Regions:
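Acidic/His metal-coordination segments adjacent to aromatic residues that form catalytic metal sites
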Residues: 97, 101, 156-163
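Hydrophobic alpha-helical connector segments
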Residues: 79, 93-128, 135, 145
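Basic, helix-initiating cap at the start of DNA-binding domains
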Residues: 2-41, 54
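Helix-turn-helix
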Residues: 18, 33, 41-79, 83
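Inter-helical turn/loop segments and adjacent helix faces that build the functional surface
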Residues: 160-165, 184-194
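Short, basic, alpha-helical segments at the C-terminal edge of helix-turn-helix-like DNA-binding modules
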Residues: 81-89, 137
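Amphipathic alpha-helical packing segments from all-alpha helical-bundle domains
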Residues: 137-160, 168-179, 198
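C-terminal peripheral helix-coil segments that are non-catalytic and often amphipathic
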Residues: 4, 18, 187-243
Length: 243
């Protein structure tokens, strides 16, 4: 009870000392400081072994404010991953703009590979997360949702609208590719991630073949013909069946 009263007092005292809202640039910067600190601890500690107090001390943020901004260590870790994903997507977008005429498939592969490049210095953190999801199903769901979010952005900016049920299936399919290739990436010590690139290309080809061989939705003749036209268009733009 005493600890909880002290935490409440810290929050109220810090709120009274500042007239800025929690969405102000200063608060955003402090949130990222906390996220960076949580991410740093994750390299050598499992999620269960990291306390918000440890994170606050590392970031140099008062405990009460850390509780108000972060809420939990898991939330801070996901915040850091969202920032890394945003960096990967925006840098890929810049590369795509400078690449000229390339297929949708090439753009998607470039986006996925660059995400692996961004996370390469943080394999220790990913290994800890892989352990944590075994006992934290909510974390597994949030990581899956976050992966699908970044995959959707990569697909859309590459030219695949990812709309409707078929679009959702493509998003989930590419997310599945990322998970499978991630196992290869964790062991890839080549300087240019050549092994990861090869596995990514192979898995994408396999996913494309499955996507064209499995007619998930049938419907009437008109719908099938429309679906065939759409599939042919996407296949061509993805670099499949381009004679």
């Amino acid at each position: 009870m005493v600890c909880w009263q002290k935490l409440q007092k810290d929050v109220f005292d810090e709120a009274a000392m500042s007239t800025q809202s929690t969405s102000s640039p200063s608060s955003d910067a402090q949130l990222m400081m906390l996220a960076d600190a949580a991410w740093m601890h994750l390299e050598s500690h499992s999620l269960d072994k990291i306390s918000l107090t440890m994170v606050a001390d590392q970031a140099g943020v008062p405990m009460g404010l850390a509780a108000a901004l972060g809420g939990s260590v898991q939330r801070l870790v996901l915040c850091k991953m969202a920032a890394l994903d945003r960096q990967a997507v925006l840098e890929t977008y810049g590369d795509i703009q400078d690449a000229g005429a390339v297929s949708i498939r090439e753009k998607i592969v470039e986006g996925l590979l660059h995400r692996f490049e961004i996370y390469t210095p943080y394999r220790g953190q990913i290994a800890m997360l892989n352990q944590s999801v075994r006992t934290h199903p909510e974390l597994a769901l949030r990581l899956a949702d976050q992966l699908e979010s970044v995959v959707r952005r990569i697909l859309v900016m590459s030219g695949d609208p990812a709309e409707g049920m078929r679009g959702q299936i493509r998003v989930k399919g590419v997310a599945g590719v990322c998970i499978l290739v991630g196992r290869v990436w964790m062991k890839d010590d080549s300087p240019d991630l050549a092994v990861t690139m090869k596995a990514l290309d192979q898995r994408m080809t396999q996913a494309e073949e499955w996507g064209h061989s499995l007619r998930v939705f049938g419907g009437g003749r008109q719908q099938r013909e429309g679906d065939a036209d759409q599939d042919a268009d996407l296949a061509g733009r993805y670099g499949v069946d381009n004679d």
